[in-house]
Amino acid sequence: GTAHFMKQIKGVKTTEVGYANGNTSNPSYKQVCNGNTGFAETVKVIYNPQIVDLELLINLYLNTIDPTSINRQGNDQGSQYRTGIYYTDSSDVHTINNTIRNIAGKYNKPIVVEIKPLQNFYKAEEFHQNYLDKNKGGYCHIRPELFELARRANEKTKFKKSDDSTLRSILSKEQ
């Protein structure tokens, strides 16, 4: 569900379902579900920061989860279902923390989204890739109306004319 959701956002190039930050190599879904590998089920998101920024991606993601829930999303339970943001660029930490801090006041319980550097990532089995495209009506914890929110969230803005004083300051008299 999260991969399909993220793919709806303009500026997201690719998504890949996988397993992150565990303690074995090349885990299978079955191994991850056993709960002893330390992996979280994740979605790698590659995006164009000139089209969509990290803050918007995080805010949209947070709309699809309960950020106060530990080891559970929807009907899925277990440590592999913990929520997290795993970054590959430490310069993103400030944006991640600020975005999380900004939503914290909306909740009565503490935010428990894990924020850590990505230590390892293994692509999940092909069955999990593009799951909702291959399984119309398949189980998804994300409410259907949120997919439309993702599609509209980053719509291109129409040209906005600058005010006259700004135009005078940047244009020559001939222009």
Where do the model's predicted regions map?
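Flexible coil/turn and secondary-structure edge motifs
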Residues: 1-175
